[in-house]
Amino acid sequence: MITLKTKVFSAIGDLCGDVIYGTPGDFTTPEKIVWRESRNRRYAQADGREHLAELNYTLDIFARSPEAAGELFARADENMAQAGFRRENAEELIEKDSGVHHISARYRALSDAQGNTYQ
């Protein structure tokens, strides 16, 4: 199975002190990125082997203010674009109970087994 998890983590892993794969846990840190591979679909095959995969990654960005969330999103978005991913969607979500500002963004790329990305 083709995946680009290492490439995604390299793009976002040092943007803030709390970058997590999977679920967010608590909100004790002022900024947090939670990410996951949200789709992995065989896009092309030959001789029974996968040659291209369509990969989608979701980044959820949490911060204590809308400005901090926007700034962290802008840096993550730039890094993901440089890594070969195309942003498909980004939206601000309201977290009224916690007071945390949340931006959810989805990125897409086609990849071969060598990690080359295509749009």
Functional labels for PLM-detected ranges:
Residues 53-85:
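Mid-chain, well-packed structural core segment of small domains
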Residues 74-119:
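Acidic-leaning, charged glycine-interspersed low-complexity segments
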Residues 1-46, 72:
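Small/polar-rich, solvent-exposed N-terminal microdomains that initiate assembly or binding
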Residues 43, 67-69, 113-115:
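Residue-level signal for secondary-structure boundary sites
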Residues 1-6, 54-57, 118-119:
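Contiguous hydrophobic segments
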Residues 47-50, 61-65, 86-90, 115-117:
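Short, surface-exposed, polar/charged, turn-prone segments marking secondary-structure boundaries
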Residues 51-64, 101-112:
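Oligomerization/assembly interface segments of phage tail-like spikes and tubes
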Residues 46-51, 96-98:
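Short, solvent-exposed beta-strand/turn "edge" segments of beta-rich domains on protein surfaces
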